[in-house]
Curated annotation (Swiss-Prot):
Region (Disordered): 1-197
Residue ranges of domain GST C-terminal in the record: 263-427
Transmembrane segments: 219-239
Lineage of origin: Eukaryota, Metazoa, Chordata, Craniata, Vertebrata
EC number: 1.8.-.-
Repeat found in the keyword field: yes
The protein's name in its UniProt record: Chloride intracellular channel protein 5
Record keyword Chloroplast present: no
Gene3D superfamilies from the UniProt entry: 1.20.1050.10, Glutaredoxin
PANTHER family xref list: CHLORIDE INTRACELLULAR CHANNEL PROTEIN 5 (PTHR45476:SF4), CHLORIDE INTRACELLULAR CHANNEL PROTEIN 6-RELATED (PTHR45476)
Annotated membrane topology: Single-pass membrane protein
Subcellular location: Golgi apparatus; Cytoplasm, Cytoskeleton, Microtubule organizing center, Centrosome; Cytoplasm, Cytoskeleton; Cytoplasm, Cell cortex
């Protein structure tokens, strides 16, 4: 068996294996799943721009710069890279042939912190098919965000148990009177690069319940992680959706966070922002983040829609089947993470089916754009499913837990996560109580 055929065989194990395909229609939740799935495909309903009829709170600005990284992580890699935009384009349908349904249950209603969500018809800004839409939240009635807990950096090297991960709310973004705090761009920028040589980047993200800290928004975290990994100096502004400063409204009228300005130009589409940053912030100065393997961009693509049907369900008799659907989606991701990439295969491992992958992330040992897209959603699923369904990711999914362990050990991920309490509160009205009716 030659090298090419062997590598192809390895990938076919993940791409063509049907063991974990949904054979039970009940796992799709019937009409509920169809309605959720229809909303996932209809990206025009996601992140509808409603700023004209909403108010923002005041904003908090934080300068962010390059964090300490190894020289290896800054070196551009060779080979072909695949941007994830194509797999997540509007033409992408992770489950072709699914019946469509009425739009009574929209994804923004499903995943919004409030029940009375406004639905405007202005141009959408985000085209990720699996993210919840930000909405105009009511005044929250819940606990304050959790205090910082044990950081993932302190985890032991052995395989963690499902309950061993707790995420701390980043101290780096605590605020005092809505002013820059904790560090400045000069403190964290590397080298002696002049300010004039670097682009001026301002990222606007959703604020938490206190109006200042980072809120629950996988879109925002996705862009936050990308900029951090690029090592570019940028400012982060948290925006509370209850009020709006006039200057922010004038900057991006009719636009929800996240969005950014790049040397004064406003950019609002998340996928296009990702593509722009990858094409603009290039080696040798900035690392390349696109995944080398196309399969990495689609790994875990159906997890969030399975989770949405599972958490929205109110019928006790449907719960087990929907839970199996989520578990199968997680298992497919686990299989991909345990399957060696072509570069992990050498003469010593060929023919050894027990020799699995040891890589840290989806596409290798460094975070890529694929991870920036998947990890924020995977974190939400983990927190919310445990809180409202007492569901833990199965301990036997060693690839999945290795992936999470390595992600929680990276500041680029943990310090851009919202507090667990923020995520739980956002889903308080979404997660429905099960009944026997």
């Amino acid at each position: 068996m030659n090298d090419e055929n062997y590598s192809t065989t390895i990938y076919n194990r993940v791409q063509t294996e049907r063991v974990y395909e949904d054979s039970d229609p009940a796992e799709n939740g019937g009409p509920l799943y169809d309605e959720v799935h229809e909303d996932v495909r209809r990206e025009d309903n996601l992140y509808v721009n409603e700023l004209e009829n909403q108010e923002y709170d005041s904003v908090a600005v934080y300068p962010v710069g390059r964090q300490g990284r190894t020289s290896a992580s800054l070196q551009p890699e060779t080979g072909e890279y695949v941007l994830p935009d194509e797999p997540y384009s509007k033409a992408q349908d992770p489950h072709p042939g699914e019946p469509t349904a009425d739009e009574d249950i929209s994804l923004e209603e499903l995943l919004s912190p409030t029940k009375d969500h406004q639905s405007d018809s202005e141009e959408p800004q985000a085209s990720d098919p699996e993210e919840p839409q930000a909405s105009d939240p009511e005044e929250p009635q819940g606990p304050d965000p959790e205090e910082p807990q044990e950081n993932g950096n302190e985890m032991e090297a052995d395989l963690p148990s499902p309950s061993s991960f707790t995420i701390q709310n980043s101290r780096a973004f605590s605020t005092r009177e809505i002013s820059p705090t904790s560090y400045s761009a000069d403190d964290v920028s590397e080298g002696n690069e002049s300010a004039s040589a670097s682009p001026e980047i301002n990222l606007f993200v959703k604020a938490g319940i206190d109006g200042e800290s980072i809120g629950n928004c996988p879109f925002s975290q996705r862009l936050f992680m990308i900029l951090w990994l690029k090592g570019v100096v940028f400012n982060v502004t948290t925006v509370d959706l209850k009020r709006k400063p006039a200057d922010l409204h004038n900057l991006a009228p009719g636009t929800h966070p996240p969005f950014l300005t790049f040397n004064g130009d406003v950019k609002t589409d998340v996928n296009k922002i990702e593509e722009f940053l990858e094409e603009t912030l290039t080696p040798e100065k900035y690392p390349r983040l696109a995944a080398k393997h196309r399969e990495s961009n689609t790994a875990g693509i159906d997890i969030f829609v399975k989770f949405s049907a599972y958490i929205k369900n109110t019928k006790q008799q449907s719960n087990a089947a929907l839970e199996r659907g989520l578990t199968k989606a997680l298992k497919k991701l686990d299989d991909y993470l345990n399957t060696p990439l072509p570069e992990e295969i050498d003469a010593d491992t060929r023919g050894d089916d027990e020799k699995g992958s040891r890589r840290k992330f989806l596409d290798g040992d460094e975070l890529t754009l694929a991870d920036c897209n998947l990890l924020p959603k995977l974190h939400v699923v983990k927190i919310v499913a445990k809180k409202y369904r007492n569901y833990d990711f199965p301990a036997e999914m060693t690839g999945l837990w290795r992936y999470l362990k390595n992600a929680y050990a990276r500041d680029e991920f943990t310090n851009t996560c919202a507090a667990d309490s923020e995520i739980e509160l956002a889903y308080a009205d979404v997660a429905k109580r099960l009944s026997r009716s």
